[in-house]
């Protein structure tokens, strides 16, 4: 029995949450396995892919949510994703939870070089993949920043404080994990209640809303200065017929 199952009934995994995890294949890992992730593996599929223990996944998810919710200022939590599939998920996560985020290539010195323009001093770091986000994890270890990571079955756990075992290679799996993490943080803060389903759709964590894209395009067009169009080459025509009549 896990710590969450033996503790409060409120934090236990519901059947609907388990169905969401299975539908998005959050429990399907890779064919490789690291020694550090061995304790999170339940079995293997017929194709050879490792199966992650869903109960341990949920236990670590709740632990990570409690750590994030305990930070007084949400901006002190930085969410990073060098993996392209995770940029949309961390954007929506930061939008709902209020954290800072860093998508795309992590610029070296973001946590260690104080003269850098985008220098940050977060209290907690959340990464999508310990392999692709290795630079952020290494810099966090130099300045004593706790690290929460979504870890697949072959992930290295060096300098990772809280490893959430899950499938971090699929866009839908990443979106579901950040959706569940955001929902749990908001519940712990008291922003939303547990008795009412969260209105935010998980699809928006990996697909872009067409209405949102249209609104951003219209706002960008309104903010851009109108280009001045001049006809001809800009010369000034004048009539010199009476120039010698003076």
Curated annotation (Swiss-Prot):
This is Small ribosomal subunit protein uS2. GO terms for molecular function: structural constituent of ribosome. Component of the small ribosomal subunit. Mature ribosomes consist of a small (40S) and a large (60S) subunit. The 40S subunit contains about 33 different proteins and 1 molecule of RNA (18S). The 60S subunit contains about 49 different proteins and 3 molecules of RNA (25S, 5.8S and 5S). Interacts with ribosomal protein S21. The keyword Ribonucleoprotein applies. It comes from the Eukaryota. Gene3D superfamilies: Glucose-6-phosphate isomerase like protein, domain 1. The keyword Lipid biosynthesis does not apply. Keywords: Cytoplasm, Ribonucleoprotein, Ribosomal protein. NCBIfam families: uS2_euk_arch (TIGR01012). InterPro entries: Ribosomal_uS2 (IPR001865), Ribosomal_uS2_CS (IPR018130), Ribosomal_uS2_euk (IPR027498), Ribosomal_uS2_euk/arc (IPR005707), Ribosomal_uS2_flav_dom_sf (IPR023591). GO terms for biological process: ribosomal small subunit assembly; translation. Its main location: cytoplasm. GO terms for cellular component: cytosolic small ribosomal subunit. It is found in: Cytoplasm. Required for the assembly and/or stability of the 40S ribosomal subunit. Required for the processing of the 20S rRNA-precursor to mature 18S rRNA in a late step of the maturation of 40S ribosomal subunits. Belongs to the universal ribosomal protein uS2 family. Signal peptide: none annotated.
